[in-house]
Amino acid sequence: MAALPQNNLQKQLELFPAKGTSNKLSLQKTKSSVFTFKKKCSPNVSASTGFIPFQQHVLKDKNVNVKQDGTHTALPKATERNKINCFFTPVYTKSGQPPQVVALKDHVHGNDSANKPPSTEDAASKKTGINTSFGSVTSLEEWDDLDDFDTSVSPPKSHAGKGGKTPQKCKNTSPVASFKIQSISPEGPTTEKHDCAKLLYDNNEVASEPRKNLHAKTAESPDQSLVCLASVEPTNLERDMCRNTDYLGTDDLEHDQETLSQVLIEEEDDCEPDFIPPSPSDESLSSPPVLKVISAQRKHKVSSLTDVNDCENTTDHLQGQSVSTSLDSKVPSQLLTLMLEICDLVDKIPISELHVLSCGLDLKKKRDMRKRLLSNDSVFRSSPADSSTVSLTSCTSSTQNRDFNVNAPKGAESLSGSSVSKVFKFNKLAVHDIGTKESENSANSAPNFMEKIGNKTSFSFRAGGDSIMENSFNFHSSVLSNSRFNTPQNEKPISSSTCTRPYSQPIDDMDNPDLDFDIDNFDIEDLDDIHCLDSPAAPSVSSKNVPQYPTIREAQLDSRNKEKNTRNNTGDTTNPSLLSDSLLKPQIENPAHERFRGFNFPHSKEMMKIFHKKFGLHRFRTNQLEAINACLCGEDCFILMPTGGGKSLCYQLPGCISPGVTIVISPLRSLIVDQVQKLTSLDIPATYLTGDKTDAEAASIYLQLSKKDPIIKLLYVTPEKVCASTRLISTMENLYERQLLARFVIDEAHCVSQWGHDFRPDYKRLNVLRQKFQSVPMMALTATANPRVKKDILNQLKMTKPQIFTMSFNRDNLKYEVLPKKPKRVALDCVEWIKKHHPNDSGIIYCLSRHECDTMADTLQKEGLAALAYHAGLADSNRDYVQHKWINQDDCQVICATIAFGMGIDKPDVRYVIHASLPKSVEGYYQESGRAGRDGETSHCLLFYSYHDVTRIRRLIQMEKDGNSHTKQTHFNNLYSMVHYCENVVECRRMQLLSYFGENNFNPNFCKEHTQVACDNCLGKKNYKSRDVTDDVGNIVRFVQDNCSLVQGRGKGRSNNTRLTLNMMVDIFLGSKSAKIQTGLFGKGAAYSRHNAERLFRKLVLDRIIDEELYITFNDQAVAYVKMGERAQAVLNGFLKVDFQDTESASSIRKQKASVVTNTSQREEMVKKCQAELTELCKRLGKIFGVHYFNIFNTATIRRIAESLSPEPEVLLQIDGVTEDKLDKYGAELIDVLQKYSEWTLPVEDICQKSGGPANVSARRSNSDHDDESCDKSSYFSSNNKKGPKRKNSSYFGKSKKRKTGGDGQQSRSKNGNSSYARKNSTAKTSSSYISGSKTGADKRPGFMAPPMPQPNRRFLKPSYSMF
């Protein structure tokens, strides 16, 4: 291995310590020493053109160039450069020849002496692979920062390029630097020549023709590289370069060369441009200084000697090279075009529609993967017409040739090289010679794109400008014509757009050891949500137009796409509002959760198996997969999801996978029982420890937990049990010591916070779990927590670094409505509303007290509605009985309950939730109302509001013994937030709820766009006028100050009659005859209606202009008297203006929107009838098998089955939620019902469309936590079709459904068993017999016989384990 030469690197590191830590992709400041071009022409020696610095460098006396054999040579002999970090490649020159250093003056005045052309043997380039100098590569640990190399030293017999942020030496010389053929060393048969440099374009022939204005005709990009050829003739180019200086002048040329030297690029002939260019600074968005030179030179327009024929010849050469080389190139194969069109169509599919497809998840993953691959595939990520950046990437193979073309419109020159003529030819490319109008839109365009064909890589460059090229290098136009200054390779394009994307290493360059890319500087927070545009179309950008959205650039585009893109890019900029959602990158709510996405974890395989087999689900909801992966990775998690969002699965699925026991802490026994029943029905070992467990049952559970490998996976406990039971704590300590304590799950975590609506002291003491079990992960879940509550939960539970998963609080299928409450008629109003809107549906009525629950239930029963009361005053057995009857709709349609009911109850078909009294907080109302419509169907949330309830609730808060005054004030604030929600008759109800929880970016036109679920405020007529009522409010405040301030001595000895309630104030303000006081304020509000007057005084209370003080009378009644508020003085001083939304009349509030009567077709009536019959069937089967009827088929699945009206099993299996196992269990009865409606059967296509259509809201939400089943097509149904034609009158389910097993406790059936599984003339067959294609005939058409009787050994009725 070649040894690294000694140098003063350490000294440079000390001089420049900050470079290594800075961003390597930032633009380095211009150094004082720049390179210039000098030439010395000698009749005997080949001219050597190199980069000569103005001053000497500290590394001048050090030689970092070694030969490949590792030996050192002394200066000034030519040396071989060792490759450091793969940024330098070996140069083979013959030693003994001194470097040709010449003065700039000779170069400027243009010596016309000819050079001796090198021989073919000496000029032959030695091809080297990527790993040619691998042995001389120094590891990154030793050379981690090349920024400290300042190689502005005179390079001996070689040319300086740029490597990293410093110039790099390379074999090839850009024609920008010199268009001569240079010979550095004498002829030698064994040396690789570094002196023959010229442009190539796939071996295009270039004619030798004298040029008068080379400065105006060399449209060479700084990104282009040179390839050494054999036997080249330099004489014409030499004379052209010398002749060109007469037009420009010495000063201009020197200025140009000084500026251009900062962006020159050189590449070696092995197609491995090992260099790292400087990146543009973020703040350097202005035009570079060279543009000023170009602008000055535009005044000197020199006519070109190039004719149209030259342009045509060049165009012909371009057509034969590659698709990306010319605009007139042949259209690629139809297959490639078709594939690109398919990709474009897939990209245009909206995400909402993509999720509905059966393969939508996989297709979305592939589409995202394709976008990422395209974004990283090449630096040429823009569309062909996108000329906003200039960047270049290296080849992946050393055998690839670099071919360049500069197509300059209207005065620009086409520069190409040929291996045949060995000379350069400059052809003028006319605009009309181009097949498309692309050049007309590329006045300031940059390189278009790159396309790989075979083993070659073609670069197509387009220089812009009509007249800008005529007196300046075409290099100026192609690189610096736009407003940004870019350098190739690893450059980060600069854009004024707010949606810029950090540059990523191209995948094509992974084989190239370009190791200067600093991945540590990558910050995922820099990524925007809408920066990934996968459209090939992009606008043509000039120096005055910067694209709003950078595009992903596809590496392979045909000319058809180029022309299409050019035609579409006539606009200045891309309008973000016109971007399709399919082109936008899917929004990531939290980019930090990106590492938890996907299925590449060790637990993923087992997780998906349990997910499908145990829970019967096939698709995760939002944030579920990320939360589950984070939980299984041992992270603390805080999950904030709305009701019905699938919180339970986030800990139940990890609990089944993780070794050990998951402790779930839940506040209510009803919630615990419901969850455990559901898990055991899924054959998941779960149990609970509550106060109603007997000692024997508790001892059995503790015994199971003490075993070496406990069967129990999830243990549900109450917070009171955790805080009070020392036996439970010791059991958890034992599990912890044996590393069998998987995690703690705190459900309904809002109970932890004192700022929440349902604070419980025992929840707050759960922080002892973190103290005792520090290494055990913790998960907190809630559906209602504003930012303050969320922060308090994390603080109380000592979750320092949790993964926070949140979702939108919007429930798009709920309809919110507030009605005025008449206290004595509220029960009758509820009956009237239920009979009108949901006469046969399940619902909940929340009441404030136990007495109201009983009264409401009695009233409903008298009016003919099946209603039962549920509150804490009932015994546990009675509560369980009421809950079970209501869940299964067993003679209980409506349940009248306090707020303690329903938390976590998973009944999907609750069609309405009525609040007969005002809730205590917005959080409580959101949670309680969210128990409606969990199946995605439209449901109602009705609230009867009366301000009288405020006083009652205030008294309840005041009488609470727990908490201090600060806590009580928090509850008062929560209460008045709820009052504000009810009093606000202008703003959308949905918007108010979401704003309370901090979700302020919700669509304000949601209700207008979805009138079916629009709230009452959005549906009502906007007959509101904003009035300035500051004067009236001032009169009210002064009246209160004079009459109701006894404490301040202003009562003037008046009696208790000065204690005025809010209703008394309204009477006085309106001038009512029943007013207590008929002076002062009396009658000043006569212009107000009573409704508006009441609203005005409530507004003053909410705005704290006046306040209410609570008193308890001798009769133990709460009365609120008016007093001055904290903002009253501001009104009196004129510092506060009060606006009031005045309504025309109170009747507009009380009017209900009449239900729209639609003409239903006969088939729709049959669908409703069938749905009702199927629901009754599920209820009967649920009673028999001891499960909830919606666990047989959920309500959404029943609705889709009813819509199909098809008895065919093949059709039913295509419906979401219908599986083979369920058809085996319940198919016979289901088919019997559907056969009654077979004449109304829809085609299969319509059924599939209805069951999975994107427009159906319920279809998107129907996959509840444990109710969805995968709907893959059954194999045995398809095999049955091969056995022959199917009988018309005989159902598939006429044959036996028995499971024949031995005495192993599995399912079994005899011939005389249940009619659901045995028919009269059928024989016993196992399920496997159907899969194999066997079919048993039936002599008679099956009918609905006696309901099946459960057997004790059926596995879906009894878990496989037994612990009691």
Swiss-Prot record:
GO terms for biological process: DNA double-strand break processing; DNA replication; double-strand break repair via homologous recombination; protein complex oligomerization; protein homooligomerization; telomere maintenance. SUPFAM superfamilies: HRDC-like (SSF47819), P-loop containing nucleoside triphosphate hydrolases (SSF52540), Winged helix' DNA-binding domain (SSF46785). Its cofactor is Zn(2+). It catalyses: Couples ATP hydrolysis with the unwinding of duplex DNA by translocating in the 3'-5' direction; ATP + H2O = ADP + phosphate + H(+). Residues 1164-1244 form the HRDC domain. GO terms for cellular component: chromosome; cytoplasm; nucleus. SMART domains: DEXDc, HELICc, HRDC, RQC. Its EC number is 5.6.2.4. The keyword Oxidoreductase does not apply. ATP binds at residues 620-624, 644-648, 934, 1194. Keywords: ATP-binding, DNA damage, DNA repair, DNA replication, DNA-binding, Helicase, Hydrolase, Isomerase, Metal-binding, Nucleotide-binding, Nucleus, Zinc. Zn(2+) binds at residues 988, 1007, 1015, 1018. Residues 328-377 are annotated as: Necessary for dimerization and homooligomerization. Belongs to the helicase family. RecQ subfamily. Monomer. Homodimer (via N-terminus). Homotetramer (via N-terminus); dimer of dimers. Homohexamer (via N-terminus). Self-association negatively regulates DNA unwinding amplitude and rate. Oligomer complexes dissociate into monomer in presence of ATP. ATP-dependent DNA helicase that unwinds single- and double-stranded DNA in a 3'-5' direction. Participates in DNA replication and repair. Involved in 5'-end resection of DNA during double-strand break (DSB) repair. Negatively regulates sister chromatid exchange (SCE). Stimulates DNA 4-way junction branch migration and DNA Holliday junction dissolution. Binds single-stranded DNA (ssDNA), forked duplex DNA and DNA Holliday junction. This is RecQ-like DNA helicase BLM. It comes from Xenopus laevis. The gene is blm.
